[in-house]
Curated annotation (Swiss-Prot):
It comes from Deinococcus radiodurans (strain ATCC 13939 / DSM 20539 / JCM 16871 / CCUG 27074 / LMG 4051 / NBRC 15346 / NCIMB 9279 / VKM B-1422 / R1). This is Histidinol-phosphate aminotransferase. GO terms for biological process: L-histidine biosynthetic process. CDD domains: AAT_like. HAMAP family: HisC_aminotrans_2. It catalyses: L-histidinol phosphate + 2-oxoglutarate = 3-(imidazol-4-yl)-2-oxopropyl phosphate + L-glutamate. Homodimer. One of its GO terms (molecular function) is pyridoxal phosphate binding. The modification N6-(pyridoxal phosphate)lysine is found at K223. Keywords: Amino-acid biosynthesis, Aminotransferase, Histidine biosynthesis, Pyridoxal phosphate, Transferase. InterPro entries: Aminotrans_II_pyridoxalP_BS (IPR001917), Aminotransferase_I/II_large (IPR004839), HisP_aminotrans (IPR005861), PyrdxlP-dep_Trfase (IPR015424), PyrdxlP-dep_Trfase_major (IPR015421), PyrdxlP-dep_Trfase_small (IPR015422).
């Protein structure tokens, strides 16, 4: 008598790649000083919340929003000086990374540096792309020659170059960025310049995007704009490439509540610029206070966070928690032994942070 084989563990329809990938690594911790997610420490101004609320109340809630957020795309295009047909917006840039992998990475190659933003690698693994990582140089700079070799050695897929870099906070020389982007574009790679933190660095690679055929800039409202809770990210590229990407975006994906908030923010960018200026000043103040520490090293940063190298990341992390500060451990990443990633907070939060770091031994 033939025996029925035992069922496979877990739901039979789940792909092995999905089974093998861990959930996104984040556990919220309730402490007075939340410096673990590179957030803007300030909420959206109350008067702008009121303006956004008035927009929401004027809209019929029983009707679907724009199919592809055309009104909001036009507003972003006006702010960026871009063709609206070359703007794609989704609920957070993480969604854009997913559709970029769907566009050019499934069964092909995703190439970036090591370490890198974890969502690049998670989406590559989830969607069955070959992941190629080129280790950063010891000073955290882009490994230009190794990157060029990797671009030439693999069939084109998706190439990410992050400026400034996460999680190190380092900005590369514009000529190095230009060199790898132009080669990648010429070889047919979908080339993504992730500019999530560009306001804190004063960098802008839109001209590289304009000059390229397969190049795009990835941007977000979560950092400098202080709208992480709204969930909105966008990209700038040419209309042809944007049209292909738009096919992968679900219909009606941007609700009118999000549209109301983002449109209001774009009409009042001065609040964002003021907060970026404060963050840059506070970043410098923290660096000046900590750089002479006897056992810890603070690395220069062009973002709203910085890396702190400690003798023992676990002990340092627990020390900061005891002082009411939560940050993010990075010590398991290549080249970041002993490192913690800490966001720049309000002046009061930074006072507490500086005192806690100076007490570390």
């Amino acid at each position: 008598m033939t025996q029925t084989p035992p069922p496979a563990p877990g739901p039979s329809g789940v792909r092995q790649a999905v089974r093998d990938i861990p959930a996104y690594p984040f556990t919220p911790i309730d402490v007075p000083y939340k410096l673990d997610q590179n957030e803007n420490p300030y909420d959206f101004p109350p008067e702008l919340k009121q303006k956004a609320a008035e927009r929401m109340l004027a809209h019929p809630w029983n009707r679907y929003p724009d199919l592809h957020a055309d009104t909001l795309r036009a507003a972003i295009a006006g702010y960026e000086g871009w063709d609206a047909a070359g703007v794609v917006i989704t609920p957070g840039s993480n969604v854009l990374i997913k559709i970029l992998t769907e566009l050019g990475g499934i069964g092909q190659t995703v190439l970036t540096t090591d370490p890198t933003f974890s969502v690049y690698t998670l989406e590559a693994a989830m969607l069955g792309a070959e992941l190629v990582l080129t280790p950063l140089n010891p000073d955290f700079s882009l490994p230009v020659e190794a990157t060029l070799q990797a671009l030439a050695a693999h069939a084109p897929g998706v190439f990410y170059v992050t400026q400034p870099h996460a999680p190190t906070g380092h900005s590369d020389r514009p000529e190095d960025v230009r060199r790898v982007v132009e080669v990648a574009d010429r070889l047919g790679w979908v080339t993504v310049i992730d500019e999530a933190y560009s306001q804190y660095a004063g960098t802008d690679y839109r001209e590289l995007v304009r000059a390229g055929k397969h190049v795009l800039s990835l941007r977000t409202f979560s950092k400098a704009w202080g709208l992480a809770g709204v969930r909105a990210g966008y990209l700038l590229t040419n209309p042809e490439l944007a049209g292909h990407l738009q096919k992968l975006v679900s219909a009606f994906t941007i609700n009118f509540l999000t549209q109301a908030v983002i449109e209001t923010a774009l009409e009042h960018p001065e609040y964002m610029r003021e907060r970026v200026a404060e963050a840059i000043a506070e970043r410098g103040r923290i660096y000046a206070a900590v750089q002479g520490h006897p056992t810890c090293t603070i690395f220069p940063s062009n973002t709203n966070f910085f890396l702190l190298k400690t003798p023992d990341a676990d002990a340092a992390y627990r020390h900061l928690l005891e002082h009411g500060i939560v940050c993010r451990r990075q010590d398991k990443l290549r080249g970041l032994d002993g490192c913690l990633r800490i966001a720049v907070g309000t002046p009061a939060e930074n006072d507490a942070l500086i005192a806690a770091i100076l007490a570390l031994r």
